[in-house]
Amino acid sequence: GTSDTETFLGAIEAWGIKKTLDLSVGMFSFGIWDKRNNLLTLARDRFGEKPLYYGVTGEGIKKAFIFGSELSGLKAYPSFNNNIDKRSLVQYLRFSAISAPNSIYKDIYKLEPGHMLKMELPFDGTIQKSEPWWSLDSIINKNNSYSKYSEMDFIEELENVLTKAIRRQSISDVPLGTFLSGGIDSSLITALLNKNSSKSIKTFTIGFEDKTFNEAPYASAIAKHLGTEHNETIISSIDILDVIPELPRIFSEPFADSSQLPTYVVCREARNNGLKVALSGDGGDELFGGYNRYFWSPNIWEKISWMPFNVRKMIGGMNLMIPTEVWELLKMGIQVDKFGQKVHKMSERMKHVKSIDELYLSLISEWNNPMKLIQNYETERIDMEYNLSHEIPAHIKEDQAL
């Protein structure tokens, strides 16, 4: 056969699992059963683009090891009775997402990106620890001679790498298009795909009736410049509210990124227009340090770290006594949205943080103490004072490396 799955099986048969993983390109997750050795192997692609859940459910003779690409599949197992994991709930309320290896359910886990898990059967109730088959750190350490390259060298190499990736992605049995927001990342992906396509590509954009948030004109200008077959959908707050009841069905577990709402709508519009595969600019900010938090923490810490902690605490308290409206009047030409609110947030952090790591984590935390929001959290004797680092999702640790 010629399908991806059949090709994968043929490669494993010829080379074994580890070499096949090393030679693989793209996104995947799979489970493969070795009948001869009673061995089940689960594996996930390098960056975790494809999900893979696994864990234990049931009790007594009904206790079983289960796995699947969606939590909904695991929940369909007849004896599934796993409760909400309250520590995962704390992580969700603090960081707006639940990162691997945790999941919203007790004893159910996400296989981490670039990891594999081997399970010998029959199942004895114990889950072995997953192991990395690929590591981003090893790639970074292997290529540490960056100083000899110029900025233009990096730009040219980046264009070569992106072009190669786009060409690989454009090999498809169905029409291909892009989600075009008009920003740098999606515009770059669209331009490269259009350049390497033999025919006009389709682009899709979501705009908003509220012109404050509407960036559709930028996307339209890019589409016109590139000559794409552009589709624009303008949505209202009512349209967004209509989507919300669908989210629990669409996503396996909660996450608080509001972009999931327009993303669902643009996917629906693309599908209705005959498009089954689309590329987007997601991940650009994470890869290239595009978020403010990456440089705010070191800049702020450099300015306040020389002060003794008690002095920082006192200044933070004094700043909080000044209303946010007054701070807006005092900003004197500083081009920062919601300046007063941000001064208050920073001042609150100054009262507690004692290191740059604590400052970074506090700035990306939605709640200072989410444990207080969860019913019976303390009475169940879960350690409320355990180190904040225990909650840190893997992607946030990677952010810190930037």
Where are these regions (language model features)?
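Cysteine-centered catalytic environments shared across enzyme families
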Residues: G1-S252, T263, C267
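Glycine-rich active-site loop/lid subdomains used to bind and stabilize high-energy intermediates
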Residues: G58-G60, E120, K142-N143, A221-N231, ...
